[in-house]
Amino acid sequence: MELQVVGANALTVSETTFGREFNEALIHQVVVAYAAGARQGSRAQKTRAEVSGSGKKPWRQKGTGRARSGDIKSPIWRSGGVTFAAKPQDHSQKVNKKMYRGAIKSILSELVRQDRLVVVEKFEIDVPKTKVLVQKLKDMALTDALIITASLDENLFLAARNLYKVDVRDVQAIDPVSLIAFDKVVVTVDAVKQIEEMFA
Protein backbone atom coordinates (compact mmCIF):
# COMPACT_ATOMS: atom_id res chain seq x y z
CA MET A 1 0.00 0.00 0.00
CA GLU A 2 1.02 3.64 -0.39
CA LEU A 3 0.96 6.63 1.95
CA GLN A 4 0.69 10.12 0.52
CA VAL A 5 3.66 12.30 1.53
CA VAL A 6 2.97 16.04 1.84
CA GLY A 7 4.70 17.81 -1.05
CA ALA A 8 6.40 14.66 -2.36
CA ASN A 9 5.81 11.31 -4.06
CA ALA A 10 3.79 8.59 -2.36
CA LEU A 11 5.63 6.25 0.00
CA THR A 12 5.20 2.48 -0.33
CA VAL A 13 4.65 0.87 3.07
CA SER A 14 3.88 -2.55 4.48
CA GLU A 15 0.25 -3.68 4.51
CA THR A 16 0.85 -5.56 7.78
CA THR A 17 1.86 -2.37 9.62
CA PHE A 18 -0.41 0.26 8.08
CA GLY A 19 -3.25 -1.85 6.66
CA ARG A 20 -4.39 -4.02 9.56
CA GLU A 21 -7.99 -4.45 10.63
CA PHE A 22 -9.16 -2.39 13.60
CA ASN A 23 -9.05 -4.54 16.75
CA GLU A 24 -10.87 -2.50 19.38
CA ALA A 25 -10.69 -5.17 22.10
CA LEU A 26 -6.92 -5.54 21.74
CA ILE A 27 -6.33 -1.77 21.73
CA HIS A 28 -8.53 -1.37 24.81
CA GLN A 29 -6.64 -4.07 26.69
CA VAL A 30 -3.23 -2.62 25.82
CA VAL A 31 -4.24 0.99 26.61
CA VAL A 32 -5.70 -0.05 29.99
CA ALA A 33 -2.55 -2.03 30.79
CA TYR A 34 -0.35 0.92 29.77
CA ALA A 35 -2.32 3.32 31.98
CA ALA A 36 -2.27 0.84 34.87
CA GLY A 37 1.50 0.52 34.58
CA ALA A 38 1.82 4.29 34.94
CA ARG A 39 0.12 4.25 38.34
CA GLN A 40 2.46 5.01 41.21
CA GLY A 41 0.87 2.59 43.67
CA SER A 42 2.96 3.85 46.59
CA ARG A 43 0.19 4.88 49.01
CA ALA A 44 0.74 3.53 52.53
CA GLN A 45 -1.27 3.85 55.73
CA LYS A 46 -0.65 2.35 59.16
CA THR A 47 -2.78 -0.24 60.91
CA ARG A 48 -3.25 -0.12 64.69
CA ALA A 49 -0.30 -2.53 64.98
CA GLU A 50 2.02 -0.17 63.09
CA VAL A 51 1.12 3.16 64.73
CA SER A 52 3.77 4.37 67.17
CA GLY A 53 2.61 4.52 70.77
CA SER A 54 2.12 2.63 74.03
CA GLY A 55 0.22 -0.63 74.24
CA LYS A 56 -0.89 0.13 77.79
CA LYS A 57 -4.60 0.06 78.56
CA PRO A 58 -5.61 3.75 79.03
CA TRP A 59 -7.86 3.06 82.04
CA ARG A 60 -9.28 0.06 83.81
CA GLN A 61 -12.06 -1.95 82.20
CA LYS A 62 -14.81 -1.20 84.72
CA GLY A 63 -15.78 1.39 87.25
CA THR A 64 -14.78 4.69 85.60
CA GLY A 65 -18.05 5.40 83.80
CA ARG A 66 -16.15 5.88 80.54
CA ALA A 67 -16.44 3.63 77.50
CA ARG A 68 -14.16 0.63 77.75
CA SER A 69 -10.85 1.04 75.95
CA GLY A 70 -7.84 -1.20 75.52
CA ASP A 71 -5.52 0.73 73.22
CA ILE A 72 -4.81 4.37 72.33
CA LYS A 73 -4.03 3.18 68.77
CA SER A 74 -7.61 2.04 68.15
CA PRO A 75 -9.00 3.11 64.73
CA ILE A 76 -11.88 4.96 66.42
CA TRP A 77 -9.47 7.17 68.36
CA ARG A 78 -7.89 10.36 67.06
CA SER A 79 -4.39 9.60 65.65
CA GLY A 80 -5.13 5.88 65.85
CA GLY A 81 -4.47 3.36 63.11
CA VAL A 82 -6.53 2.88 59.94
CA THR A 83 -8.97 -0.04 59.98
CA PHE A 84 -8.27 -1.33 56.47
CA ALA A 85 -4.96 0.40 55.81
CA ALA A 86 -3.92 0.86 52.18
CA LYS A 87 -0.58 -0.71 51.32
CA PRO A 88 1.81 -0.19 48.37
CA GLN A 89 0.78 -2.31 45.42
CA ASP A 90 1.84 -3.03 41.87
CA HIS A 91 -0.97 -2.23 39.40
CA SER A 92 0.91 -3.33 36.27
CA GLN A 93 -0.72 -5.81 33.91
CA LYS A 94 1.11 -8.26 31.71
CA VAL A 95 0.92 -7.61 27.97
CA ASN A 96 2.75 -9.86 25.53
CA LYS A 97 5.06 -8.23 22.97
CA LYS A 98 2.93 -9.64 20.15
CA MET A 99 -0.20 -8.03 21.62
CA TYR A 100 1.53 -4.68 22.16
CA ARG A 101 2.89 -4.60 18.61
CA GLY A 102 -0.48 -5.67 17.23
CA ALA A 103 -2.21 -2.83 19.07
CA ILE A 104 0.28 -0.24 17.78
CA LYS A 105 -0.14 -1.48 14.20
CA SER A 106 -3.93 -1.52 14.55
CA ILE A 107 -3.88 2.09 15.81
CA LEU A 108 -1.57 3.22 12.99
CA SER A 109 -3.81 1.52 10.41
CA GLU A 110 -6.90 3.21 11.84
CA LEU A 111 -5.11 6.60 11.78
CA VAL A 112 -4.45 6.05 8.05
CA ARG A 113 -8.12 5.16 7.40
CA GLN A 114 -9.31 8.25 9.29
CA ASP A 115 -6.82 10.54 7.45
CA ARG A 116 -5.24 11.44 10.79
CA LEU A 117 -1.74 10.29 9.84
CA VAL A 118 0.23 13.05 8.07
CA VAL A 119 3.47 11.90 6.43
CA VAL A 120 6.07 14.59 5.67
CA GLU A 121 9.52 14.43 4.06
CA LYS A 122 11.05 16.07 7.15
CA PHE A 123 9.86 18.19 10.05
CA GLU A 124 12.35 20.54 11.66
CA ILE A 125 12.85 24.13 12.83
CA ASP A 126 16.05 26.17 12.97
CA VAL A 127 15.61 27.63 16.47
CA PRO A 128 13.99 26.27 19.66
CA LYS A 129 11.21 28.87 19.65
CA THR A 130 7.57 28.05 20.38
CA LYS A 131 6.23 30.76 18.06
CA VAL A 132 8.28 29.32 15.16
CA LEU A 133 6.75 25.88 15.73
CA VAL A 134 3.25 27.34 16.12
CA GLN A 135 3.63 29.13 12.77
CA LYS A 136 4.88 25.96 11.07
CA LEU A 137 1.90 24.01 12.40
CA LYS A 138 -0.44 26.84 11.39
CA ASP A 139 0.92 26.67 7.83
CA MET A 140 -0.01 22.97 7.82
CA ALA A 141 -3.46 23.71 9.37
CA LEU A 142 -2.57 21.76 12.53
CA THR A 143 -3.35 22.69 16.13
CA ASP A 144 -3.54 19.35 17.96
CA ALA A 145 -0.71 17.08 16.85
CA LEU A 146 1.81 14.45 17.86
CA ILE A 147 5.06 14.85 15.92
CA ILE A 148 7.12 11.68 15.45
CA THR A 149 10.68 11.93 14.12
CA ALA A 150 13.35 9.28 13.51
CA SER A 151 15.54 10.75 16.27
CA LEU A 152 14.62 13.35 18.87
CA ASP A 153 15.09 16.88 17.49
CA GLU A 154 16.11 19.09 20.42
CA ASN A 155 14.83 22.29 18.79
CA LEU A 156 11.42 20.71 18.20
CA PHE A 157 11.32 19.20 21.68
CA LEU A 158 12.13 22.52 23.40
CA ALA A 159 9.72 24.49 21.21
CA ALA A 160 6.82 22.10 21.91
CA ARG A 161 7.24 21.95 25.70
CA ASN A 162 5.01 24.98 26.23
CA LEU A 163 2.25 23.78 23.88
CA TYR A 164 -0.57 21.87 25.56
CA LYS A 165 -1.87 20.13 22.43
CA VAL A 166 1.47 19.39 20.76
CA ASP A 167 3.99 16.70 21.65
CA VAL A 168 7.26 15.60 20.05
CA ARG A 169 8.52 12.01 20.23
CA ASP A 170 11.09 9.88 18.50
CA VAL A 171 10.09 6.45 17.18
CA GLN A 172 11.44 4.67 20.27
CA ALA A 173 9.14 6.69 22.56
CA ILE A 174 5.77 6.14 20.86
CA ASP A 175 3.06 4.43 22.87
CA PRO A 176 -0.62 3.52 22.28
CA VAL A 177 -2.00 6.26 24.55
CA SER A 178 -0.12 9.11 22.84
CA LEU A 179 -1.05 7.82 19.36
CA ILE A 180 -4.78 8.03 20.09
CA ALA A 181 -4.65 11.20 22.22
CA PHE A 182 -4.07 13.70 19.39
CA ASP A 183 -6.21 14.73 16.41
CA LYS A 184 -3.32 14.34 13.97
CA VAL A 185 -0.08 12.36 14.02
CA VAL A 186 2.71 13.90 11.93
CA VAL A 187 5.38 11.37 10.93
CA THR A 188 8.55 11.90 8.91
CA VAL A 189 9.45 9.48 6.09
CA ASP A 190 12.49 8.24 8.04
CA ALA A 191 10.29 7.63 11.08
CA VAL A 192 7.82 5.61 8.98
CA LYS A 193 10.67 3.39 7.80
CA GLN A 194 11.86 2.92 11.39
CA ILE A 195 8.34 2.05 12.53
CA GLU A 196 8.11 -0.59 9.81
CA GLU A 197 11.41 -2.13 10.93
CA MET A 198 10.37 -2.10 14.60
CA PHE A 199 6.93 -3.62 14.11
CA ALA A 200 7.55 -5.83 11.08
Curated annotation (Swiss-Prot):
GO MF annotation terms: rRNA binding; structural constituent of ribosome
Annotated GO CC locations: ribonucleoprotein complex; ribosome
SUPFAM superfamilies: Ribosomal protein L4
InterPro entries found in the cross-reference section: Ribosomal_uL4, Ribosomal_uL4-like, Ribosomal_uL4_dom_sf
Pfam families per UniProt: Ribosomal_L4
Region (Disordered): 43-71
An example Gene Ontology biological process: translation
Intrachain S-S bonds: none
Keywords annotated in UniProt: Ribonucleoprotein, Ribosomal protein, RNA-binding, rRNA-binding
Record's keyword annotation contains NAD: no
Record-linked PANTHER family: 50S RIBOSOMAL PROTEIN L4, LARGE RIBOSOMAL SUBUNIT PROTEIN UL4M
NCBIfam families, alphabetized: rplD_bact
Function: One of the primary rRNA binding proteins, this protein initially binds near the 5'-end of the 23S rRNA. It is important during the early stages of 50S assembly. It makes multiple contacts with different domains of the 23S rRNA in the assembled 50S subunit and ribosome. Forms part of the polypeptide exit tunnel.
Assembly and binders: Part of the 50S ribosomal subunit.
Family assignment from sequence similarity: Belongs to the universal ribosomal protein uL4 family.
Stated name of the protein: Large ribosomal subunit protein uL4
Gene assigned in the entry: rplD
